[in-house]
From Swiss-Prot:
Residues 402-525 form the CMP/dCMP-type deaminase domain. It comes from the Bacteria. Ligates lysine onto the cytidine present at position 34 of the AUA codon-specific tRNA(Ile) that contains the anticodon CAU, in an ATP-dependent manner. Cytidine is converted to lysidine, thus changing the amino acid specificity of the tRNA from methionine to isoleucine. It comes from Deinococcus radiodurans (strain ATCC 13939 / DSM 20539 / JCM 16871 / CCUG 27074 / LMG 4051 / NBRC 15346 / NCIMB 9279 / VKM B-1422 / R1). It is found in: Cytoplasm. This is tRNA(Ile)-lysidine synthase. Its EC number is 6.3.4.19. ATP binds at S46, G47, G48, A49, D50, S51. HAMAP family: tRNA_aden_deaminase, tRNA_Ile_lys_synt. It holds the Pfam family MafB19-deam. Keywords: ATP-binding, Cytoplasm, Ligase, Nucleotide-binding, tRNA processing.
Amino acid sequence: MSLFHLLRRSVTVAVMSESAPNHTSARRLTQPLEPFVGRQVLVGVSGGADSVGLLRALLAVGALPAVAHLDHALRPESVDDAAWVSDLCARLGVPCEVTRIDVGAVAARRNWNLEAARRLRYDVLSRAAKHSGAEVILTAHTRRDQAETVLMELLRGEGRIRGIPPQRGRVRRPWLNVGRAEIETYLRGLGQDWREDASNADPRFTRAWLRREVMPVLLTRFPAAETALAQVAELGAEDDAALQALAARLTPHTPLDRQPPAVLRRWLAAELRSGGLDFTAEQLRDLAGALNAGQTRHLTLPTGRDVTVTGGHLYTAPCDWPEPDFPLPPDWTRRTRQAGDRIRLAGGTRKLSDVLTDAHLPRAERDRVPLLTDEHGAVQWVGVQPPLWAVGARESLGLPADPLHAAMGEALALAQQAAERQEVPVGAVVLNADGEIVGRGRNTSREDGDMTCHAELAALREAAAGLGTPYLSDCTLVVTLEPCPMCLGAALEARIGHIVYGAANPKAGALGGVSDLLADHWGWRPTVQGGVRAGEAARLLREVFGEVRRRSADTPQTPNAETPAPRSSRSTSASGKPTMLE
């Protein structure tokens, strides 16, 4: 909905209330302060009507306020403001802490604009709250401040329109729905004066310019513009909270290219902020667009840090590549890649450049990946995560096989057995805490006439029977294909500790292939690692389904329980036709 329509939508109600007889009383101002009755609170008081009104209203309801005042030294009169606030607090019997900071000098030294430098105020408030023992910090932001903030967010083109939050940390802003006129009326009724800050009328400051030049024009056409803009902030904050919750549910194995752009932007913002990185709204949109489209993008952030999006991943720092954890043979050499490097893998010899590209490594990082080569210069080991070995290299050093690599080999052998019986080619094994196989399984759905006979369930049953317990929290489930919801549910019920899978499951995957069920809060959460020997697992699937298609083309027929149909899931379709997953 456009800002224009939101303004129009709020005009009727607001104008009716403003045109009605004015029965505004102190009750409207004091009611939001009732949660603070009898509590120690710190109030930021500048001397203006809003903050003075908040102080007087807190005293009226029985709160226990202390005052903090920042003399920002931006005007010669700021010294008089500080003295005025101190005198007011003395007359009211309220503790007062005054701090003087040359905000202009700080802004120049740190290359801030003056509006940004005013954030120093919250540092002052936090220190004063600690000194006074206050539980919360209260500021007197009003509906006018909220409306101005929404306008600034809109004009800056920010991706999120949230306005001023009612609460952030220990800071509370109880008067965001209160108008300035109500506060002035309240103070006049008390016979209380206040100070006027001339900088609030200085058009060099964006907020002051909006207040003096823009809002009067808006109010001429839309008398309830202030209320409407405050409502935009409230609705925007609700929407933002919902989208933030969706972003927080993304797990390391969730495919980012399937997320809505609004969710991606919030996920990216959280990731960048967690690394202490600043960014612009345009950069955030650019990175989110690249993630959504599966593209590669390299950007330099305002702090000078380079970030990269590639292969559906965000890289904010140089990668920490693993070092060899075994003795190096004397004729092996440690180096980085060179033109023409190749490595012999299970599927044949490949260019190292293609291997690193398929691993979606940032281009700038590919020249940093450590390699080990033999006396002939052939690549034997690649220091990616997990490390990649050439065929026979590990064995030539007398090193034990990588447990997960070996376990996936057993699962692939079971998947091959399933394929030979015209089953969906999926195999699974369960490893105990020592890495020993304690359960094996393959798909037998057609063999047994039961579509719940999946490889994972068979392996879990065998492991539970052998170990004498249904709970397998110290065990690892290794399966050639990303589990479906049924099998993931069984693994959760078994309290499996780790899940390792090979190929992604774009038709029925429950770990990101279709939906990431672990994004929800279950009573148990295993760790997940995908992509182990994924190429071999995917190749087996392609071979099986390629044969199915060729056979179907040679002998047209309606798929039935004995003849697998191409491109199916490991369940029965709505039409009753058995399906298989590719």
